Curated annotation (Swiss-Prot):
Keywords: Cytoplasm, Fatty acid biosynthesis, Fatty acid metabolism, Lipid biosynthesis, Lipid metabolism, Magnesium, Metal-binding, Transferase. Transfers the 4'-phosphopantetheine moiety from coenzyme A to a Ser of acyl-carrier-protein. InterPro entries: 4-PPantetheinyl_Trfase_dom, 4-PPantetheinyl_Trfase_dom_sf, ACPS, Ppantetheine-prot_Trfase_dom. Its cofactor is Mg(2+). This is Holo-[acyl-carrier-protein] synthase. Belongs to the P-Pant transferase superfamily. AcpS family. It comes from Pseudoalteromonas atlantica (strain T6c / ATCC BAA-1087).
Amino acid sequence: MAVMGLGTDIIEIGRIEKQLTRSHRLAQRVLTATELAIFDEHSFPARYLAKRFAAKEAAVKALGIGIGNGISFQDVEVHNLPSGQPFLKFYAKFAQLCEQRNITSSHISISDEQHYAIATVILESP
């Protein structure tokens, strides 16, 4: 496998908490319907949203583009295996670009500590 892209993003969880006190618009913009359902029931919604935000930003950085260049936050979805290990699903324009670039697998690491959430994504081709 060849590494086709590497992206990392870090975000201050407090920034997300402030946004959520005003409105849930950021959550609706960043999260897919599946993720939003989990967010609505989550014990720590700001932490959940911050980790998803960082993961999606890391994914677009790994692809070498940014949100808004035909790519939406909705094009990347973060899931977890029963073990807790995260994995990504790609849709729409993001999936098309992966196919065009022969990207067939992704790896993600997400972590959070008191004030910050961070994610790193690696995209690979055969």
